[in-house]
Amino acid sequence: MPTPKKGPRLASSPAHERLMLANMATSLFEHGRITTTLPKAKRLRPLAERLITFAKRGDLHSRRRVMRVIRNKSVVHKLFTQIAEQMEQREGGYTRIVKIAPRKGDSAPAAIIELVTEPVSPKKAVVKEAEAATKVAAKEEQTEAAAE
């Protein structure tokens, strides 16, 4: 069977990459942050955010989809109970990648990927409401001008 040519690979085969990302996601949800290389962190971020989105839904099908990737039941339980509740107000951007000094042995670019646990600032919510109100007011003015 030929190996897929689409996109860069972190490991020797696509199956190995899937397993490696699943293990890294398990460690991320278990510990809250992990130190790894920058390319691995960049490949892990979309997977972790997708799994958190499934956990926020909270239904049985979402739990089963997460269990396909994360095989540890205690980590899945933590994801659905604790992490999903922390991320309830957040609409995305559940993880943060911070670059750190290169790894000592081989000078590989290292990074820390962590879950963002800070609450969403209320200022952003107020700004979004104000922008929405401005758009509604502009549309109303256009309809009134067209009616006259």
From Swiss-Prot:
SUPFAM superfamilies: Prokaryotic ribosomal protein L17
InterPro entries cross-referenced by the UniProt entry: Ribosomal_bL17, Ribosomal_bL17_CS, Ribosomal_bL17_sf
A biological process term (GO) from this entry: translation
Keyword Disulfide bond: no
Keywords associated with the record: Ribonucleoprotein, Ribosomal protein
GO molecular function annotation: structural constituent of ribosome
Keyword Iron-sulfur recorded: no
GO CC annotation, single: cytosolic large ribosomal subunit
Family: Belongs to the bacterial ribosomal protein bL17 family.
HAMAP family according to UniProt: Ribosomal_bL17 (MF_01368)
Subunit structure: Part of the 50S ribosomal subunit. Contacts protein L32.
Protein name: Large ribosomal subunit protein bL17
Organism field: Bifidobacterium animalis subsp. lactis (strain AD011)
Top-level taxonomy: Bacteria, Bacillati, Actinomycetota, Actinomycetes, Bifidobacteriales
GN (gene name): rplQ
